[in-house]
Amino acid sequence: MSISDNNMSGRSHDPEQIDLIDLLMQLWRGKVTIIICIVVAIALAVGYLAVAKEKWTSIAIVTQPDAGQLASYNNAMDVLFGANAPEMTDVQAGFIGRFSSAFSALAETLDNQQEPEKLSIDAAVKGQTLPLKVSYTGKTSEEAQKTLAQYIQQVDEGVAKELNADLSMSMETRLADLQKSLAAQEAVAKEQKTLRIAQMTQALKVAQQSNIKLPQVQQVDQVSQDSMFMLGSEALSSMVENEATRPLTFSDQYYQTRQNLLEVQALEVAPDSVHAYRYVMKPTLPIRRDSPKKAITLVLAVLIGGMIGAGVVLGRNALRGYKAKAE
């Protein structure tokens, strides 16, 4: 037996061996079926593209506000807390931190709606806390851009309102403390005046009883409380009258407290002047939609249609071959 005979014998004894040429010929003969399946798949894909909801994503990048955006707020903090006021960098970090937390809370709320909305916030650069990338997915590119800008403004206004409310509360507390301090210092000054008048009146009585009319000492600073009567009744009488009509005497601390009170009362922070963020990149107008992807959908339709058509052709031929063997 020749080698060719052995090969033919081996091929005839292996019925499960795949003949690629025969397989291709089967597919070619069933090309009409395959083409029909592809056309049907493309038609279904076109129908899907026509009814599927489009998704467009607008992106913005924000970071902490500039010092100029917080000038009035920072000035108010300096007036309220003086040397204990927080640094500008801490104020900026606090604002953007509140913005990030509020934005995340809003995104979670929108996601839990009956009709969820996709709003997100993440670090723009991996491994860095700032800047922040915020995005919104809408039905059209214009809607996505407009809605993202609205949500950023909404969060910014909310944060500014909260921080201004905290500032107003701090102002009220500071005013109350300063007013109490002034009242206490005024009470002390009144007590000191009353005490001085009482001491002078007592010295006047002693001088009158001792019949001392003229001063008996050369220098007034040498007179103590016990020897004040030595100033004489005439001088003491004038001193009592002058002390009674003289305004209260206050220390430098009183006037500093008074100045602080007036500065706090004059504080006024306009809510519109405070912002919790600064744009690095404003909301974009997307030019490519996220889904459905027309090109990818049509390519997949052709591939899936072709695979289904090929499966139909090969399956039909295999069934015919099985029936022929059975007969």
UniProtKB/Swiss-Prot annotation:
Residues in compartment: Cytoplasmic: 1-31, 316-327
Instruction: Provide an example Pfam family for this protein.
Output: Wzz
Alphabetically ordered keywords of this record: Cell inner membrane, Cell membrane, Lipopolysaccharide biosynthesis, Membrane, Transmembrane, Transmembrane helix
Describe the family membership recorded for this protein in Swiss-Prot or TrEMBL: Belongs to the WzzB/Cld/Rol family.
Query: Can you name a GO cellular component term?
Result: plasma membrane
Could you give a GO molecular-function term held by this entry? Answer: protein tyrosine kinase activity
The organism's place on the tree of life at top rank: Bacteria
Which InterPro entries does this chain map to? Answer: Bact_polysacc_biosynth/exp, LPS_length_determ_N_term
Q: List the disulfide bonds.
A: none
Question: What is the recorded name of this protein?
Answer: Chain length determinant protein
Mind telling me which NCBIfam families this protein's record contains?
A: PRK15471.1
Which parts of the chain span the membrane according to its record? 32-52, 295-315
Question: To which species is this protein native?
Answer: Escherichia coli O111:H-
GO terms under biological process: lipopolysaccharide biosynthetic process
